[in-house]
Swiss-Prot record:
A Gene Ontology BP annotation from the UniProt entry: heme biosynthetic process
Protein name: Uroporphyrinogen decarboxylase
Claim: Cytoplasm is one of the keywords in the record: yes
InterPro entries: UROD/MetE-like_sf, Uroporphyrinogen_deCO2ase_HemE, Uroporphyrinogen_deCOase
Description of how the protein assembles with itself and partners: Homodimer.
Lineage per the UniProt record: Bacteria, Pseudomonadati, Pseudomonadota, Gammaproteobacteria, Lysobacterales
Species name: Xanthomonas campestris pv. campestris (strain ATCC 33913 / DSM 3586 / NCPPB 528 / LMG 568 / P 25)
Reaction catalysis annotation: uroporphyrinogen III + 4 H(+) = coproporphyrinogen III + 4 CO2
Pathway(s): Porphyrin-containing compound metabolism; protoporphyrin-IX biosynthesis; coproporphyrinogen-III from 5-aminolevulinate: step 4/4
Name of the coding gene: hemE
PANTHER family named among the record's database cross-references: METHYLTETRAHYDROFOLATE:HOMOCYSTEINE METHYLTRANSFERASE RELATED, UROPORPHYRINOGEN DECARBOXYLASE
Example GO molecular function: uroporphyrinogen decarboxylase activity
Length: 354
């Protein structure tokens, strides 16, 4: 039995006593306790692949702040790693793959990993976190989107130009669709396994959807997000596990994402929540969308921006605050002040009371 079900109620667009709040990368390098755990574990992957440490890190922000959800500590690149691409991290450069997929042979060899063998460490972490939370708040599981995962899988790491994957989109679109279809199968299986292990809400991160032109987004990202929303078994009624589709730079597509079958759409700060709510038309809950850079501001500036964000949603939603989950428009950065995060959380709680 959940002691705090605000998040789930808001995602179902049901009344809540105040707007729920959680933050992308709420467990991260801005916390000194996270940095201490990382030093002990030796590396990011040393934390993510150890269920006990993943559980410890997941719970750290909840011990500091009265957040309304925990989100699994993991990485979006666990799926391609389990497919054999071999994930590693370079200090200052981020994630890389030793075996990127760039031709038909490599792409056709890919299969959906077994979730309770190759990715058992993730499922064990979900089970352990649920046990440790003991119903305090819901646990969010997540995956990268097919397009975003394909970007890393083809580029071999992060990219500024996305030259290789865009070249494939123009020169061999059917090959790219084959890859995206395989990755979509894997994402559905991965989220389904997290749900079975105990995740109570699910989020798909389409981090790089915003690098696409509208026509390319509608060909190479949106159909696969829609497939996830429609094919991922989530139960029904009050037992249904809500699905959030989050995208960076997805403001132009809120109406289409709202028609996907997902319960909620997460947006960044490049669209106002008023505009997003009007486009959503009451079909889904919305999550977002404070610019993370607001946390560099003074406490008064943070409170002011939190108030504007809450009011913007209500303005676009016919005066109602229901159906809104407060979050940042993207993840926090390592140099952010934990005290300012506390100011943000307190401001949401105070200013959104019904």
């Amino acid at each position: 039995m959940l002691k705090n079900d605000r998040l789930l109620r808001a995602l179902r667009r049901q009344p809540v006593d105040r707007t729920p709040v959680w933050l992308m990368r709420q467990a991260g390098r801005y916390l000194p306790e996270y940095r201490a755990t990382r030093a002990r574990a030796g590396s990011f992957l040393g934390m993510a692949k150890n269920p006990d440490i993943a559980c410890e890190v997941t719970l750290q922000p909840l011990e500091r702040f009265p957040l309304d959800a925990a989100i699994l500590f993991s990485d979006i690149l666990t799926i391609p790693d389990a497919m054999g691409l071999e994930l590693y991290f370079v200090e200052g450069e981020g994630p890389k793959f030793r075996h990127p997929v760039r031709d038909a042979d490599a792409i056709h060899r890919l299969g959906v990993p077994d979730m309770e063998t190759e990715l058992r460490y993730v499922m064990d972490a979900v089970r352990l976190i649920r046990r440790e939370l003991d119903g305090a708040v819901p646990l969010i599981g997540f995956s990268g989107s097919p397009w975003t995962l394909a970007c890393y899988m083809i580029e071999g790491g992060g990219s500024k130009e996305y030259a290789r994957i865009k070249a494939m989109a123009f020169n061999a679109p059917q090959l790219l669709h084959h890859l995206l279809s395989t990755v979509t199968d894997a994402v559905i299986a991965y989220l389904s396994a997290q749900r079975a292990a105990g995740a109570q809400a699910l989020q798909v991160f389409d981090t790089w959807g915003g690098v696409l032109s509208p026509a390319m987004y509608r060909e190479f990202s949106l159909p696969y997000l829609t497939r996830i929303a429609q094919e991922l078994e989530r139960g029904s009624g009050e037992e249904r596990t809500p699905l959030v589709l989050f995208g960076k730079g997805n403001g132009a597509y809120v109406s289409e994402l709202a028609a996907s079958g997902a319960e909620a759409v997460g947006v960044d700060w490049t669209i106002s929540l008023a505009d997003a709510a009007e486009r959503a038309g009451g079909r889904v809950a919305l999550q977002g969308n404070l610019d993370p850079a607001t946390l560099y501001g003074s406490p008064d500036a943070i409170r002011s921006e939190v108030g504007k964000t809450l009011d913007s949603y209500a303005y676009g939603n016919g005066g109602s605050r229901e159906g809104h989950v407060f979050n940042l428009g993207h993840g926090m950065s390592p140099d952010m002040n934990p005290d300012h995060v506390g100011v943000l959380v307190e401001a949401v709680q105070t200013l959104s009371k019904r």
